[in-house]
């Protein structure tokens, strides 16, 4: 067979594959378009302009770039409030700020998606390293069942114990399972809230942003956290992370990032915020 025939065969294979998957591609485009509309509305409603891209130094009081970026993320993620900062070095750091901000000695943290990331495991259960365990915070976990949230075991647990915080990991991480869908999460939260209405719901949202039409905040998450190096940064944010959710919980996390007296009121960034704004603007399509 000559080269032209090979080219023709290859072209036919590609065309057939694209035709077979056309509905899937259309669904992906629809999700991207819907999320892009959210981002555009957030930029418009917060009157984002070139002045928000400028860098600052010193304490960062009244840093309009930082404060407006927080508002944009809150709107895009359907949250009351958001903390977005280049000083958050990773997703694990963002999650750690939220955990240490919310939890107190003798509180119980329950993971309903089994083991957490290795880097977060030492945050929760490390010995002598300033972990949650060192501060008297208890940790329990319920393993997934065939890659799905084990609602029956969760119900049994909650009938006996009322944890302060219930933790979901949305992505598969390093395990061989599918990522949790928003429907999976929403169904689980509905069940949990009927049994333990006072338990707070936290979601590790890393790799989950813009993959569906809405975020976990719409389906009952009290607080979510993620990295700007992944989806939400659109491939342009050079560093950073975010925390979003109920205003009082986000502020508790902000007090761990800075100080209990200043919270989210401070934090400068000399290099400026253009890449962060441009990253979130492009993220729906990039993801």
List PLM regions with ranges.
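N-terminal pre-P-loop "Q-motif" helix
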Residues: 66
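Conserved PLP-enzyme active-site core in the AAT-like
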Residues: 3-24, 29-30, 38-45, 49-52, ...
